[in-house]
């Protein structure tokens, strides 16, 4: 009897330990693929594509408008408490570094929360980052289609809150570098230094 109790205690301790380790790794690497995310690490992964959304001024925006320019594309949402603003600050710094080196690049923020992130909300939010930022929204179907093209994972986080408008989103956190033809070049993680983009462009 006593040995069975000990086995149960040991088993429970192992489960708790594994759960704690998983949580720690998830918090330390929020930009790695989450459950359900398509693997973008494969060399032959097709990332990106044409799209049409609405910008922060309420105007129709076609991805063709990015042709002829390098661009940095990030998917997030304005209610994101830490990962998104951290990423947008890094993109802002990267744009500044590239500008100092005479490299023109367009930063683009695409919301994954279109029901709350209206053009007006995006416009106000992006005032905190580089003035060149283009903010894009659309309906749920449009956003999902664009996110799928970029292999972006996102989903509503589980919550016990009954308020339909008070929710968080789990999402991957990559910054995509696209060439002047709108083709994917490379993606950068949350922990990548802004200077990494410059280093990549200089070596390629």
Swiss-Prot record:
Cu cation binds at residues 80, 84, 171. The keyword Metal-binding applies. It comes from the Bacteria. InterPro entries: SCO1/SenC, Thioredoxin-like_sf. CDD domains: SCO. One of its GO terms (molecular function) is metal ion binding. SUPFAM superfamilies: Thioredoxin-like (SSF52833). Gene3D superfamilies: Glutaredoxin. Keywords: Copper, Metal-binding. Signal peptide: none annotated. PANTHER family: ELECTRON TRANSPORT PROTIN SCO1/SENC FAMILY MEMBER (PTHR12151), LINALOOL DEHYDRATASE_ISOMERASE DOMAIN-CONTAINING PROTEIN (PTHR12151:SF25). Belongs to the SCO1/2 family. This is SCO2-like protein RBE_0699. It comes from Rickettsia bellii (strain RML369-C). The lineage of its organism: Bacteria, Pseudomonadati, Pseudomonadota, Alphaproteobacteria, Rickettsiales.
């Amino acid at each position: 009897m006593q040995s069975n109790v000990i086995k149960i205690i040991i088993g429970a301790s192992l489960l708790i330990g594994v759960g704690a380790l998983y949580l720690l790794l998830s918090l330390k690497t929020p930009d790695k693929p989450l459950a359900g995310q398509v693997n973008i690490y494969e060399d032959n992964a097709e990332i990106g594509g044409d799209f049409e959304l609405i910008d922060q001024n309420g105007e129709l925006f076609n991805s063709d408008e990015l042709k002829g320019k390098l661009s940095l594309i990030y998917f997030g949402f304005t209610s994101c408490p830490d990962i998104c603003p951290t990423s947008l600050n890094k993109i802002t710094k990267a744009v500044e570094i590239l500008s100092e080196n005479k490299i023109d690049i367009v930063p683009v923020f695409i919301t994954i929360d279109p029901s709350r992130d209206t053009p007006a909300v995006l416009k106000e939010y992006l005032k905190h980052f580089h003035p060149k930022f283009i903010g894009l929204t659309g309906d749920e179907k449009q956003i999902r289609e664009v996110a799928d093209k970029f292999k972006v994972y996102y989903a509503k986080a589980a919550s016990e809150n009954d308020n339909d408008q008070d929710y968080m989103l789990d999402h991957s956190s990559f910054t995509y570098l696209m060439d002047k033809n709108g083709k994917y070049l490379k993606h950068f993680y949350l922990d990548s230094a802004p200077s990494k983009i410059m280093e990549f462009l200089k070596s390629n």
